[in-house]
Curated annotation (Swiss-Prot):
Biased composition (Basic residues): 107-126
This protein's record includes keyword rRNA-binding: yes
Cross-referenced PANTHER family: 30S RIBOSOMAL PROTEIN S13/40S RIBOSOMAL PROTEIN S18, SMALL RIBOSOMAL SUBUNIT PROTEIN US13M
NCBIfam families assigned: uS13_bact (TIGR03631)
One example GO MF annotation: rRNA binding
GO CC, alphabetical: cytosol; small ribosomal subunit
Gene that this sequence comes from: rpsM
Assembly and binders: Part of the 30S ribosomal subunit. Forms a loose heterodimer with protein S19. Forms two bridges to the 50S subunit in the 70S ribosome.
Gene Ontology annotations of biological process type: translation
Any one Pfam family match given in the protein's UniProt record, by short name: Ribosomal_S13
Protein's recorded name: Small ribosomal subunit protein uS13
Coiled-coil stretches noted in the UniProt entry, renumbered to this chain: none
Listed SUPFAM superfamilies: S13-like H2TH domain
Protein family per UniProt: Belongs to the universal ribosomal protein uS13 family.
Length: 126
């Protein structure tokens, strides 16, 4: 297994797919990395020479913000929104959707499990 940006990448996958295991690199960014380094994207990661691996590491290190740095930046951006008291920051704090989605019926992923109502419990008959 090759290790790039602190992530073990699977040798049996194509380079384009293996690079997406790194946080911050998706399909389009993986293709861009392959084009910029001149390494064919259909080549499997296990078939790469040590020179090609070093070339990949250098390119990713110098040009793309990945893993810990990217996660830290996202967290700091959210913290900044909360600190300055924006509406988006408030939504993050309350655990509700941030981008304007409706919450009357949906947003279960963000809000968590549904809470039962007291009105639906059967009343005791005399």
């Amino acid at each position: 297994m090759a290790r790039i940006a602190g992530v073990d990448l699977p040798d049996h996958k194509k380079l384009e797919v293996a690079l997406t295991y790194i946080y911050g690199i998706g399909w389009s960014k993986a293709r861009e990395v392959c084009e910029q380094t001149g390494i064919p994207s259909i080549k499997k990661l296990g078939e790469l020479t040590p020179e090609e691996l070093n070339q990949l590491r250098r390119y990713i290190e110098q040009n793309i913000k990945v893993e810990g740095d990217l996660r830290r930046e996202v967290q700091l951006n959210i913290k900044r929104l909360v600190d300055i008291g924006t509406y988006r920051g408030l939504r993050h704090v309350r655990g509700l959707p941030v981008r304007g989605q409706q919450t009357k019926t949906n947003a279960r992923t963000r809000k968590g499990r549904r809470k039962g109502t007291v009105a639906n419990k059967k009343k005791v008959s005399k």
